[in-house]
From Swiss-Prot:
InterPro entries xref list: Ribosomal_uS19 (IPR002222), Ribosomal_uS19_bac-type (IPR005732), Ribosomal_uS19_CS (IPR020934), Ribosomal_uS19_SF (IPR023575)
Ubl conjugation found in the keyword field: no
GO molecular function, one term: structural constituent of ribosome
Protein name: Small ribosomal subunit protein uS19
Pfam families linked: Ribosomal_S19 (PF00203)
Cystine bridges: none
Family to which this protein belongs: Belongs to the universal ribosomal protein uS19 family.
Species name: Mycoplasmopsis pulmonis (strain UAB CTIP) (Mycoplasma pulmonis)
Keywords: Ribonucleoprotein, Ribosomal protein, RNA-binding, rRNA-binding
Function field: Protein S19 forms a complex with S13 that binds strongly to the 16S ribosomal RNA.
One BP annotation, GO: ribosomal small subunit assembly
A GO CC term assigned to this protein in UniProt: cytoplasm
Amino acid sequence: MARSLKKGPFADEHLLKKVEKAIESKSRKPIKTWSRRSTIFPDFVNLTFQVHNGKNFIDVFVTDDMVGHKLGEFAPTRTFGGHGEDKRKKK
């Protein structure tokens, strides 16, 4: 379900402060965040974020196509181990 237009997009304040600081200092250092729920704004383009997936941090380089999506969409939380293998087929 989409967010109401009258509410507007959401991003955590502490993340916006980190982004402003990175833009001012022209730092190429990744911005570490646990805020998977934050929307990607146009200001975030060409910045690298380290998004927490519950276990470790995944590097996410933001491009133009990602604007409007959430940071968490680009850091998968589940790993697929494959389906159970049939023991009878094994030779």
